[in-house]
Amino acid sequence: MPVLGSQRRLLGSLNCTPPATFPLMLAPNRTGPQCLEVSIPNGLFLSLGLVSLVENVLVVAAIAKNSNLHSPMYYFICCLAVSDLLVSVSNVLETAVMLLLEAGALAARAAVVQQLDNVIDVLICGSMVSSLCFLGAIAVDRYISIFYALRYHSVVTLPRAWRIIAAIWVASILTSLLFITYYNHTVVLLCLVGFFIAMLALMAVLYVHMLARACQHARGIARLQKRQRPIHRGFGLKGAATLTILLGVFFLCWGPFFLHLSLIVLCPQHPTCGCIFKNFNLFLALIICNAIVDPLIYAFRSQELRKTLQEVLQCSW
């Protein structure tokens, strides 16, 4: 990506240098103290991408196979899996081409590699934006199902869900094209960072409100059963743990990447910010890890989906 760092660009592989021997090293900074740089080998990128690819393909296959899963909620989960799938495909493709170029097994002109790099950048940016959008859509869907349970099926209908899905994909494609075209404009970066903060705030507010309602409901049941403390404490701790994992994974996997974008605007020449810029590959690896974790949080917890997944695996064997 042009603005995000030079480490992962395909053009750099045309004139490659030997990789670092140690994965964790101190990178010299001419204008300040030494920086801690985490080097992510291409093999690790490839492995993470393949794991995420397999996981999300299974989610899409399971939802497509089982007609009981053809509902708005599972369609949003399916689209999240497709977004994560595109993140994985783009990174696997880029890593594979880089490895082939470095090994001399693939001969390509700089112009061809530039075009391929642009296509991959559009894929990565579009899939990132759509992934964030579908995470927000899933949160809104769950919120409506809890607070407007009686009206849920009249509010969240299949036609509306399809329109939302189409709008998200169109917006993601347009956003990625604008980002690649105007990557050197500060406003574009600030809009992306603002979008991430908005999604984080939306998810935090909705899930915290859902947890509060669930705890209130549990207290009501406990009072009826005259066992208020044991049920309330256990349920509250379990709900808080689930919420912490959900929001924590989201923030830890996406936060460093958008911190990187923020610092490009705020302090592009500062030595400390320069140290953070050197770890861009680590931030990309965390996003791929998020694509691995998403199916575990949003898809595989469904008993119906797990059952269908077993059938899919049995058919494949």
Swiss-Prot record:
Pfam name, any one: 7tm_1
Membrane-side (Extracellular) residue stretches: 1-37, 94-118, 184-191, 267-279
Residues with glycosylation annotation: N29
Keyword Nuclease: no
Keyword Glycosyltransferase in record: no
Record InterPro entries: GPCR_Rhodpsn (IPR000276), GPCR_Rhodpsn_7TM (IPR017452), Melcrt_ACTH_rcpt (IPR001671), MSH_rcpt (IPR000761)
Keyword list, A-Z: Cell membrane, G-protein coupled receptor, Glycoprotein, Lipoprotein, Membrane, Palmitate, Receptor, Transducer, Transmembrane, Transmembrane helix
TM helices/strands, residue ranges: 38-63, 73-93, 119-140, 164-183, 192-211, 241-266, 280-300
Localization of this protein: Cell membrane
MF annotations from Gene Ontology: melanocyte-stimulating hormone receptor activity
SMART domains: 7TM_GPCR_Srsx
Lipid addition sites, S-palmitoyl cysteine: C315
Membrane-side (Cytoplasmic) residue stretches: 64-72, 141-163, 212-240, 301-317
Main location group: membrane
Topology in the lipid bilayer: Multi-pass membrane protein
PROSITE patterns xref list: G_PROTEIN_RECEP_F1_1 (PS00237), G_PROTEIN_RECEP_F1_2 (PS50262)
GO cellular component entries: plasma membrane
Subunit structure: Interacts with MGRN1, but does not undergo MGRN1-mediated ubiquitination; this interaction competes with GNAS-binding and thus inhibits agonist-induced cAMP production. Interacts with OPN3; the interaction results in a decrease in MC1R-mediated cAMP signaling and ultimately a decrease in melanin production in melanocytes.
Family that this chain belongs to: Belongs to the G-protein coupled receptor 1 family.
Function description: Receptor for MSH (alpha, beta and gamma) and ACTH. The activity of this receptor is mediated by G proteins which activate adenylate cyclase. Mediates melanogenesis, the production of eumelanin (black/brown) and phaeomelanin (red/yellow), via regulation of cAMP signaling in melanocytes.
Protein name: Melanocyte-stimulating hormone receptor
